[in-house]
Amino acid sequence: MADGFDIHIDQEQAARLKVVADRLGMSVSEYAVALIDAGLTGAAPKAIDPDPAIDEAIADAIERGDEPAISRDEFRAHIRRVTAGLG
């Protein structure tokens, strides 16, 4: 059985990991372990709260112009990059 080991990630990956961990109220280490566990078990990692009121507040902010909007094509391109591991 492995005794454990350290994993090094680059500065950009660390920053992105910290942003999401902070949003979820987790430490970076806790979130990294959750992602690894999800990858090993096929379970979904902890996600941002699925409360519809949050989605509605985001949509309202976009409609008011408080948050930027992106086109469907930009969104799809972003999803392709994320699922390919390119950020």
Swiss-Prot record:
Disruption phenotype: Cannot be disrupted, suggesting it is a functional antitoxin. No visible phenotype when the relBE1 operon is deleted. It comes from the Bacteria. Keywords: Toxin-antitoxin system. Antitoxin component of a type II toxin-antitoxin (TA) system. Neutralizes the effect of cognate toxin RelE1, but no other RelE or ParE toxin. This is Antitoxin RelB1. It comes from Caulobacter vibrioides (strain ATCC 19089 / CIP 103742 / CB 15).
